[in-house]
Amino acid sequence: MLLSDRDILAAQADGHISLDPWTPEMVQPASIDVRLDRFFRLFNNHAYTYVDPAENQGELTEQFEVKPDEPWILHPGEFALGSTWEYVKLDASIAARLEGKSSLGRLGILTHSTAGFIDPGFEGHITLELSNVSTLPVKLWPGMKIGQMCFFQLSSPAEHPYGSATTGSHYQGQRGPTPSRSYVNFYKADITD
């Protein structure tokens, strides 16, 4: 069940959903707007000749911080990691989805490549996979609305929520834009017959 504005407010009051800072004015009819933090990670193109999700490529991205009153310029075709200003915490009965803002999409800004789903039990800043698919550079301002989260009530609480010992939760408690940890417990099925 997708939560309405009144359900989001009730879930926050009951401790099922937490966003810090909590700003009730960000609540929309069936979502809550989230804002952009001032930290970004860019690919260090000179450190590696390729990307391998099975390897720890610790220097693949480099973190940058902009001043709160200065924009980050995302150039055409560029990809960067950002994060929400809000620290998000979901209990075992709530899952969420991050979606982009329509107004930014119309400027060519994508807020996530594939990872828009947020598991029940997650807590941390949401890492954004920012892309500029327009033909012009776009200014991204710290504190601006960058996306919206919608919330889903599970039919029953997750038995093993994100962050539990059995789920291999690589991003629990993440602060700021967090690089890929795909190499941790990398899985590749044997597909030979």
From Swiss-Prot:
Pathway: Pyrimidine metabolism; dUMP biosynthesis; dUMP from dCTP: step 1/1. One of its GO terms (biological process) is nucleobase-containing small molecule interconversion. It catalyses: dCTP + 2 H2O = dUMP + NH4(+) + diphosphate. The keyword Disulfide bond does not apply. Keywords: Hydrolase, Nucleotide metabolism, Nucleotide-binding. One of its GO terms (molecular function) is dCTP deaminase (dUMP-forming) activity. It is an enzyme of class 3 (hydrolase). DCTP binds at residues 101-106, 119, 127-129, 148, 162, 174. The record marks 116-117 as: Important for bifunctional activity. Its EC number is 3.5.4.30. The active site is at residue 129. Belongs to the dCTP deaminase family. Bifunctional enzyme that catalyzes both the deamination of dCTP to dUTP and the hydrolysis of dUTP to dUMP without releasing the toxic dUTP intermediate. PANTHER family: DCTP DEAMINASE (PTHR42680:SF3). Homotrimer. This is dCTP deaminase, dUMP-forming. It comes from Bifidobacterium adolescentis (strain ATCC 15703 / DSM 20083 / NCTC 11814 / E194a). The gene is dcd.
